[in-house]
Amino acid sequence: LVLANYPNKDGRLANGVGLDTPASAVHVMTLLLEAHYDVQELPANSAALMAQIMAGPTNWLTDRAERSGGETLPLVDYLAQYQTLPYALRTRIEERWGDPSSDPFFEPTTATAVGGFKLSILRFGNISLGLQPARGYNIDPTETYHSPDLVPPHNYLAFYFWLRNSQGAHAVVHLGKHGNLEWLPGKALALSEECLPEAILGPMPHIYPFIVNDPGEGTQAKRRTQAVIIDHLTPPLTRAETYGPLRDLEALVDEYYEAAGIDPRRINYLRREILTLTATSGLDKDIGFQGEEAGDLAKLDAYLCDLKEAQIRDGLHIFGQTPEGQQLRDLTIALARIPRGNGKGGDASLLRAMADDLQLAFDPLDCDLSVQWEGPTPPSLACLSDDVWRSNGDTVERLELLAQHLMEATAQAPGEKSSAVMAKICDSIAPTLAQCGPMEGEGLLTALAGQFVSPAPSGAPTRGRLDVLPTGRNFYSVDSRAVPTPTAWALGWKSANLLI
């Protein structure tokens, strides 16, 4: 199991986009143990795993020499494998990084140890877990991670030489988007022996758990490192809402607009309080206050409304596990929040369906949240919150709260349209979502068994692409069913007619 480390600091160990990589690594090893792989001394949890990683050598050079543990590839073994590389490739590496013994990750021979490369690798029986090396040292990692011409240093090669030959690994799993192996110099397709990904990884079976909404970079791994993708869910989403100073500001703004035209003295006091709190929190700069109190207050109100209803991540996904509890509820609502397919019947937006059933006469997905609400205030929404009901945003908030109650079966759908969407959620969306965790684990074990992993489309499930679920499959980037698009077909038809 190879974990990414970008940038190569200890504060960024085991980072993967949208993935709780340490917890995922522990869960993957648990799955391997249950599948009768030889897994020994399994860490109790992600914290225990990270403590083990931090206790040993990492990519952070500062105090590396003071850390014990890890695996060592003796220089003699390294040179034996290094000499098998094409001469032109070795020349490029040595011109950039010098000879192997000059690498800062190389430890010379001492009275008690043979000289070699100290590697960031832990062993758990037949399962090894390592930190992918950086693409170089004394360089800016943010500028070189995707560099098309920077050859890797000797310690990088030593890491993969150890996996392939010293451990004799049967497969490598790069856990989470994304590592740097697939970005090493070489051809984009049909790699040769002088292309770094091919020279380093060789014919090793390569399994790559990868976030389902990024087919572009996943395709890079497929083309350049023969990766079998096992796609995984995006992080669970929820409403941002407001808290702390933002919650205080929201209450003050609501009170301000309630007092408008009624109590001028209270308005002046509230205005000062609002502007002071905004300046203290730094929001005045974020929002772009112009020094015009009325205009600035309107900007603040719009900002708070937009922020409150924004969809944000609620934690990270753990590979092989479906979200539970509130995370599962909120993610299900996020999947049904926007229309899917033709946007009709069960594929309609849940929020729009509820708004139509309640005869609110507005679009909750496409409205100015800060505009004053002038529509009806049905009791089924009014009872859900004691907060002021003043703006479109307050109406959307109550629709979101009603959706939560519908998911928890503590309220009934307000009408025919929302009933159709809820039926689709119960019959299709929720069961499919529940399959994601188990299928991710099953997909990984299937790949490790050398068996076929089913293909699937890719994309963001929270943007209407429910066809990418369940995850745990080998995604592709271009869906042949969607090619050509109607526009492309129309233009092609016109071009053909002009040619004829």
Residues covered by each model-derived region:
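Ligand/cofactor-recognition surfaces for anionic moieties
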Residues: 2-500
